[in-house]
């Protein structure tokens, strides 16, 4: 790509990405800390990918997506997943209208721009698969009719750490449909003091709508234009291939630790998330640091560990970090 094209693209992105600061400003009114979580929400929104958040209750996961939807003046719905939830509770159902003497469609909470699927691993597989099908197809079928879901459509699913009781682990094939899996940690001590003050004095500010859904759709188009050099493409595929065939990449010690590596969807999502990250950083091209910044969240749920790895307390994060340290940076 020639220099003038890059310069023009940079200028275009500078113009189109101004809303990022506005959204961050609004979200910072109510969210203390958790910078990575809010940044990953924006990446998912721009790259048209869904997000899986893992963390104990009370870490502002619900507040974050609710604040984001308010800042974009979009529809928000929250679905609490429970063991007795049915697919119809999620997508909707046909109910008989005595007045019309016919069946009419009652739409479920999935019909919103931002859907918070809270504690997704507390409901059985049939409900999980109904949600994941809606995520993949951007449409649902009720009775014999198919309905398109609104655009933009972003699902943020939360799950409790698997060690907790009463949870159903998500199957690997379904987890793979989430672009990012983000681990949410406790806030720092100073941040927690701010949270404390904000909540006991009722000083939290109101979120203002600063962006329209149409602006997000336009930004997505621009995001796709971010330049990805062939060297960066090779870097991305090397990272994903190293998760499948570690011995070919001087990572022999992990050969018996990985049961399966990243799928082609991992390569696609790593490229799209890197483009969105570059967009947020006001750049018209992807650099290796962008790939490294999102690699952990894109790959951590796409690598399966063997019993040997679990016996030695090896984590997917360790493997990904070792891959990033081993693969030559272009």
What are these regions (language model features)?
Residues 10-17, 30, 167, 181-253, ...:
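Conserved C-terminal "switch" segment of AAA+ ATPases
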Residues 97-101, 119, 123-127, 135-226, ...:
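Canonical AAA+ ATPase core
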Residues 55, 118-119, 130:
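Walker B catalytic acidic pair
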Residues 13-59:
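Pre-Walker A (pre-P-loop) alpha-helix and adjacent loop at the N terminus of AAA/AAA+ ATPase modules
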Residues 45-82:
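Walker A/P-loop
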Residues 51, 115, 153:
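Conserved beta-strand position immediately N-terminal to the Walker
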Residues 1-8, 13-14, 248-330:
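C-terminal engagement/docking regions of AAA+ P-loop ATPases
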Residues 40-43, 96-116, 145:
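Conserved alpha-helical scaffold flanking the Walker A/P-loop in AAA+ ATPase domains
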């Amino acid at each position: 790509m020639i220099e003038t094209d890059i310069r023009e693209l940079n200028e275009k992105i500078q113009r189109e990405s101004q809303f990022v600061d506005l959204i961050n400003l609004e979200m910072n009114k109510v969210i203390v800390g958790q910078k990575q979580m809010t940044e990953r929400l924006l990446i998912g929104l721009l790259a048209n990918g869904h997000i899986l958040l893992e963390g104990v209750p009370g870490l502002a996961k619900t507040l974050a997506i609710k604040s984001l939807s308010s800042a974009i003046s979009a529809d928000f719905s929250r679905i609490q997943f429970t063991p007795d939830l049915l697919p119809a509770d999620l997508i909707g159902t046909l109910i008989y209208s005595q007045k019309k003497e016919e069946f009419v469609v009652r739409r479920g909470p999935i019909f919103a721009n931002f859907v918070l699927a809270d504690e997704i691993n507390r409901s059985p597989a049939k409900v999980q698969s109904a949600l994941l099908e809606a995520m993949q197809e951007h449409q649902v079928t009720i009775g014999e009719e198919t309905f398109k879901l609104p655009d933009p459509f972003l699902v943020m699913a939360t799950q409790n750490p698997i060690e907790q009781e009463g949870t159903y682990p998500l199957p690997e094939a379904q987890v793979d449909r989430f672009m990012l899996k983000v681990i949410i940690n406790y806030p720092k001590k100073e941040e927690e003091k701010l949270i404390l003050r904000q909540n006991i004095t009722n000083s939290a500010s109101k979120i203002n709508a600063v962006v329209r859904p149409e602006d997000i759709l336009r930004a997505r188009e621009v995001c796709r234009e971010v330049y990805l050099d062939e060297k960066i493409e090779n870097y991305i595929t090397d990272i994903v291939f190293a998760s499948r065939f570690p011995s070919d990449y001087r990572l022999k010690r992990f050969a018996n630790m990985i049961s399966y590596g990243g799928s082609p969807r991992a390569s696609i999502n790593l490229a799209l998330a890197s483009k969105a990250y570059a967009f947020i950083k006001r750049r018209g091209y992807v650099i290796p640091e962008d790939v490294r910044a999102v690699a952990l969240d894109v790959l951590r749920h796409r690598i399966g560990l063997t019993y040997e790895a679990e016996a030695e307390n090896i984590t997917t994060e360790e493997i990904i970090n070792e891959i990033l340290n081993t693969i030559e940076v272009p």
